[in-house]
Regions:
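Short, basic-rich loop-to-helix N-cap that marks the start of a DNA-contacting helix
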Residues: 36-53, 386
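Class I SAM-dependent methyltransferase Rossmann-like catalytic core
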Residues: 76-120
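Conserved class I S-adenosyl-L-methionine
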Residues: 120-133, 154-155
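Class I S-adenosyl-L-methionine-dependent methyltransferase module
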Residues: 134, 141-279, 402, 406-419, ...
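A short, conserved alpha-helix within the catalytic core of class I
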Residues: 263-269, 291-306
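A short glycine-rich, Lys/Arg-flanked "PGG" loop and its adjoining helix->strand segment in the class I
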Residues: 276-278, 298-313
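Conserved beta-strand signature within the Rossmann-like core of class I S-adenosyl-L-methionine
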Residues: 314-322
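Conserved Class I S-adenosyl-L-methionine
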Residues: 330-369
Length: 451
């Protein structure tokens, strides 16, 4: 059993028993600092583990561990259609090429680099939803500027094969500029990906671990070798729709590990191995990792709480999601009056995460910040004369696409609405009113206290 699993077991017991973790350590194994040592990554003997499990079993009614708190049913979606909006490639690509969100998000994430405290042997970063890799690549540039001689361990989660390809296109330049880098991509769930360890024994037995030591010293050589991964990815990086929840799930868990062959000696202690990998991240990026209309409990239990557990001492998780109250939502409400896809605020989410973590939250700081620090703006990039006067169809359509993408309006509703021209008229009115189009995101930070 790994440290994180032991900590989860102890945290659940302490929450159910209303017991301090130090008290648990003293009563179970006569060590008040047991939990603190586990969080530092210290190992325990089999005898100690047996005593922990025996104490929990003896203290619980029926001799069984406590049930998990805040059970959240999986989100139900129609498996036959109505797929998650952001998997529609056409709308996604039009949005990212006409709006500045990726750049602005990367700048906001970059501000956190001044507040982290990396420890040897590497600065460890996890991107909980890499997308096309634009945000991560920009953050890695900022990391190199601030920590030019520090080894990097960069891990990212992404289910989409197309996004994995786009991300890998950006890796050669990053490895050329910063050779002391280990780069990992996985398709595992949020509760699995930071540890590169599937929760299900069946999934763990079928896991595919692919390590590539890149030869050469130029980005061109790295690019050619990464391109050779194409057939492997097509064969193994596959997703199905869960018949139970209607959400995309991996067929088999996969981890791809990339690093430079000429830096293998330096990176040996950083390179993860199958069955022997850790989380302990200095920085976790959680930018738009959940659907706008997902429940606060789903976000807390399935996504943010597991990621918060993956922070090392002094580590920081920055979460970012859409805020609304901008010209984009004006377009949506002009067409669908009363529509409000952004009902969950950062304050509600952080309260739910704190509740879900239970006693494990004692080592964490939950920072919602004031609006002037949390909320930031990004724009649809257009020339001034394109959003005033007679607004062309292409500009109006780009603005409409951005608004419905951010609000995550389902395709069946879009098809019904776009049969007429009223949606473009409403879009033009908002563009003229504001002389442009912009959106607001809000951010929050969860940080683990330093030792």
């Amino acid at each position: 059993m790994k440290n994180d699993q032991i900590l989860s077991l102890i945290s659940e017991f302490c929450r159910q028993a209303d017991m301090a973790e130090s008290t648990f350590g003293r009563r179970a194994v006569n060590d008040g600092k047991l939990v603190h040592r586990l969080r530092e990554g210290k190992r325990i003997t089999i005898d100690t583990l047996d005593r922990i499990q025996a104490y929990i079993a003896a203290a619980m009614p029926g001799g069984v561990p406590p049930p998990r708190g805040l059970e959240v049913p999986p989100e139900k979606r129609d498996p036959r259609g109505n797929f998650r909006f952001f998997e529609n490639r056409q709308k996604y690509l039009l949005f990212v090429h006409t709006c500045s969100e990726k750049r602005v998000v990367a700048e906001r994430v970059g501000l956190e680099l001044g507040s982290i405290h990396p420890r040897p042997p590497a600065l460890r970063v996890f991107d909980a939803g890499v997308g096309d890799g634009t945000v991560l690549a920009r953050v890695m540039r900022s990391m190199h500027g601030r920590f030019p001689h520090m080894p990097f361990y960069i891990a990212g989660k992404e289910l989409s094969l197309e996004d994995v390809r786009l991300t890998l296109d950006k890796v050669p330049d990053r490895l050329f500029e910063h050779p002391a880098t280990v780069f990992v991509l996985t398709n595992m769930y949020y509760a699995e990906a930071p540890w590169l360890t599937p929760a299900s024994p069946a999934a763990a037995a079928g896991m595919i671990w692919h390590e590539v030591a890149l030869r050469g010293a130029s980005s061109g050589e790295f690019e050619a070798q990464i391109a050779e991964l194409g057939p492997f990815l097509e064969q193994n990086w596959r997703a199905n729709v869960s018949p139970r929840s209607g959400m995309p799930v991996y067929e088999r868990p996969v981890a791809v590990v990339l690093y430079r062959e000429d830096h293998r000696f330096l990176l040996d202690s950083i390179i993860p191995r199958a069955g022997r990998s850790e989380a302990n991240f200095d920085l976790i990026i959680a930018s738009q990792p959940y659907r706008a209309k997902s429940s606060v409990n789903f976000r807390a239990k399935r996504i943010i709480a597991p990621l918060a557990r993956a922070l090392r001492a002094g580590g920081r998780l920055i979460g970012i999601h859409s805020h609304g109250q901008d010209p984009g939502i004006e377009i949506i409400q002009a067409v669908w009056p009363g529509e409000n896809p952004f009902a969950v605020s950062r304050h509600e989410l952080l309260r739910a995460v704190k509740y879900e973590l239970g006693s494990a939250a004692r080592d964490l700081n939950f920072n919602a910040y004031a609006d002037n620090r949390s909320i930031f703006r990004y724009d649809m990039e257009a020339l001034p004369n394109e959003v005033t006067g007679s607004i062309g169809t292409s500009t109006a359509f780009a603005a409409w696409n951005a608004a419905v993408y951010v609000a995550q309006i389902e395709d069946d509703r879009l098809t019904e609405m776009t049969q007429g021209g009223r949606y473009l008229d409403a879009t033009r009115e908002v563009l003229r009113k504001h002389n442009g189009l912009w959106f607001y995101d809000e951010s929050y930070v969860i940080s683990r206290r330093r030792d």
